[in-house]
Amino acid sequence: MTRPVSRATFLSGLIGLGAFAVAPNAHAARNSDAESYVQSNATAALAALADNNATQRRQQFQRLMTQFADMDRIATYMVGRYSPALRADADLRRDWRVAFQDFAIATYESQFQNLSGGIVRVTGSEERVAGRDVIVTSEVRPPRGSTMQVRWRVLRSGEGWKVMDIAVGRDAVWLGQIQQRQFLAQLDENNGNVRALINDLRGRTTAMRNTPARS
């Protein structure tokens, strides 16, 4: 039986990741282009969440997130060793990407609402691979509450910079690997049935979308 992914489980996985943390390197070069990319896009995303019109807020936030993050690449990464099933079935691959993207964006919109209208300040960056793989560090100061430290792993491809992972908090714990492990645990339990995982995420996304939101 597939173990459902709750919103709390999703976010606890995001905040709980530590295995992929990248140790700071005081001698690593900075990348001003990647820093500017994060500054402008993170600022725009938080500004979108401040829109009082729920429909416009959701549409604008989704548009920005799909531009900001490499959702297709992240979606494939999330199923790990089960990704050959996606390569073999175009319909399954499309449905999985859509379901994962909708679930992830709905979760971020809900949980990051308290940061809406916050001020983003990029504080530095560290090149892991020169010109291609960069960790950008930032602080987010919400209208209410404490400043939050956020790190962004961005990769440069033919389409420019794209976010691949985010780390939240002073411990610089990353978001991607534990969520992948949770998905893989579900797939292991249901004999690799990606379609069952898709249906689970669709149900969870619908529940989040139907939850009354600020308007």
Regions found by a protein language model. Name each.
Residues M1-R3:
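N-terminal secretory signal peptides that target proteins for export/translocation
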Residues A26-R30:
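Boundary at the C-terminal end of the N-terminal hydrophobic targeting segment
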Residues I166-S215:
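Low-complexity, intrinsically disordered terminal/linker segments enriched in charged
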Residues V5-L11:
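N-terminal export leaders
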Residues W96-V98, I105-M148, D200-S215:
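Surface-exposed, charged secondary-structure patches
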Residues T147-I178:
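Short beta-strand edge/turn micro-motifs at domain boundaries
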Residues N31-F112:
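Early exported N-terminus immediately downstream of N-terminal targeting peptides
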